[in-house]
């Protein structure tokens, strides 16, 4: 069975991979200090995706060992290659927001989140791709300090629906270019935000931690208060239970 220690150790490894990517990002950023914004952008647009690709491939390679050793699943060698592939247009779009959007006070901070998300997605994509190919159901493994969004997605399958997520519905959400096409992505559990460290894990090898019970209670309470499965309303109620209770009266 997959243990909390297994997950913690793998997240630690992914964190080390991400830190190397962040160091490269900061080095690039400092090397561009003093340049006009447009000139700096042209360089960043070309170099940052290259950095992400290198470390995303490392994350995908590490995940092949993680899933094989802890969950007894070894996917095709092509899955590592697929997981390493980066949707460069998606990365550049997020980078452009960081550099030029109104109200952004720390472009580097936002760029850091973009890099982290797409590097770690290399590991998640390997698992989701393999689960999809083999038809294995999966759960979303979230840390105890996860945000409300991740708590909700982590508990939806193990609680309300009582069955694992289907990767056939969710795997493409983490970003595979043309395959990123499905609406309602959050409803399938395959959406991961910046600085998220949730991981897809084989359902029949994972026992949800005790704190999932508390999260499920929070989710059920929010669902009762808003009376809908609308994602935004549920998130608001989970973050503001007292206000939601007052609105319901």
Predicted ranges, named:
Residues 1-130:
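N-terminal alpha-helical interaction blocks
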Residues 1-34, 121, 125-249:
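Activation/maturation switch segments at domain boundaries
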